[in-house]
UniProtKB/Swiss-Prot annotation:
NCBIfam families: kup, PRK10745.1. The keyword DNA repair does not apply. It catalyses: K(+)(in) + H(+)(in) = K(+)(out) + H(+)(out). It is found in: Cell inner membrane. It comes from Klebsiella pneumoniae subsp. pneumoniae (strain ATCC 700721 / MGH 78578). This is Low affinity potassium transport system protein Kup. Belongs to the HAK/KUP transporter (TC 2.A.72) family. InterPro entries: K+_transporter, K_trans_C, K_trans_N, Kup. It is a multi-pass membrane protein. Keywords: Cell inner membrane, Cell membrane, Ion transport, Membrane, Potassium, Potassium transport, Symport, Transmembrane, Transmembrane helix, Transport.
Amino acid sequence: MSTDNKQSLPALTLAAIGVVYGDIGTSPLYTLRECLSGQFGFGVERDAVFGFLSLIFWLLIFTVSIKYITFVMRADNAGEGGILTLMSLAGRNTSARMTSVLVILGLIGGSFFYGEVVITPAISVMSAIEGLEIIAPQLDTWIVPISIIVLTLLFVIQKHGTGMVGKLFAPIMLIWFLLLAVLGARSIYANPEVLQALNPYWAVHFFLQYKTVSFIALGAVVLSITGVEALYADMGHFGKLPIRVAWFSVVLPSLVLNYFGQGALLLKHPEAIKNPFFLLAPEWALIPMLIIATLATVIASQAVISGVFSLTRQAVRLGYLSPMRIIHTSEMESGQIYIPFINWLLYVSVVIVIVSFEHSSNLAAAYGIAVTGTMVLTSILSATVARKNWHWNKLFVGLMLVAFLCIDIPLFSANLDKIVSGGWLPLSLGMVMFTVMTTWKSERFRLLRRMHEHGNSLEAMISSLEKSPPVRVPGTAVYMSRALNVIPFALLHNLKHNKVLHERVILLTLRTEDAPYVHNVRRVQIEQLSPSFWRVVASYGWRETPNVEEVFHRCGLEGLSCRMMETSFFMSHESLIIGKRPWYLRLRGKLYLLLQRNALRAPDQFEIPPNRVIELGTQVEI
């Protein structure tokens, strides 16, 4: 590591604390309260307190520290992480059939994230604002309105970007974690007996004593690790080392101290179960704690919103979602984007959730099922990467996968009990997103296959046009081509109806590679097919936004000059008709028509000047 890198490590570590750990860092606000609230048939008993604390501690060690921090984060695509990245990596060295299975698993995981993300801002902010119940019980009716106001402000500022505000995130979250540690240590000092719960004996004893109920109670324990996927998803922003250093040096110690501090408080004062987090603080510090807790939960919500934007962009670029407007809010950081449609759809969903559930305890009953489902899928996909890509020993990978699933599957199974009490919400939202993504991908493939059924060879057509050329008009025509060696529909229809051809024709294909970025040296490939025909293939990563003006600037540097304002861009606009299908495929076809009708048009998608675009319509039956 260079000196510069060494100097930047503390800064990157601090930044990671501010963004990556917001969700898992605000879990102490509600986790232990939900574990011991009496919903499982037992109250604040010594064995129950020790059992829950032991389970939380070892879950943080095994699932977060070992599985995610140590193992899963090894799987990166040019430094990038996330469930769709893991899906892509897992499918590289497998059979076509296995790749299809892995793609389905990855899409389910991504869909689960969309389902859970509606709950995260609501439960985080509400649990902070509920500190009002401790400061002034008569203000409890204001919890829902204040929560909505706070989140409204957060969603409104998204279009302006979070660059300036984001600079405050890291110091605020560092203060938050230090407060967690100090408050927890203060309580542990007053009742050090609680440290016995570090012994895994108490976790085992908890299951033996409470039997079936203890299994169901795992649904509350999992609240302590919600947000764990963010460690992997945000890897590309900060790198592995800063995220790992932040976890082991600041986040993990602070969380453990605070959870055990709450446990120590409850052992002495069981009545504190109404809100053990805020009751850890001395009375004079309640208002400052309410303020810092609200700020921390807003930051946690911001991290989730940014995560949704990033996942959506990746899904769009990989062809699983329809094109939509993506606005870059920073000229310096490509990761800072704003997607208006997703922003306001998420905002409306969050407000509906807050109004419907009214209290964070009610939301906790819906929280966790999608998170644990994603954890199961992450274990399977990462084990596939270890075996197929890294060529690890088959026995070792098998034992490791069994160990992970022995934790993940019970956690997921325990959360299935939440379906009736609210777990149906993230599952339903996830199912909708999975349906949308698979519909767009499959119907788009069906459409392209239908359009290319004419079977004419591109080379043969070009040869024929050169031998018997139609009327030539001056200038350059660019035809957007979705695939190589396929005649663009717009070119066919221009020849059929207008019976003319430009002096110079460029067939442009924009391709998304299985990488976050493509180096400018590899951006453009130019091939002259005949004296008047050129093929240009422009490659982009899934974190990049295609820009046709940039493509032709690169072409000019490589000898194919093309002035944007003297070039005509021909595109086909398909008018779709649903053919004879079974009823369920007709429904899918209608959903695709709806998605296409609202998709971003190609000129806007590729930043082509509107006055240079000519769209030729065609009717296609799918």
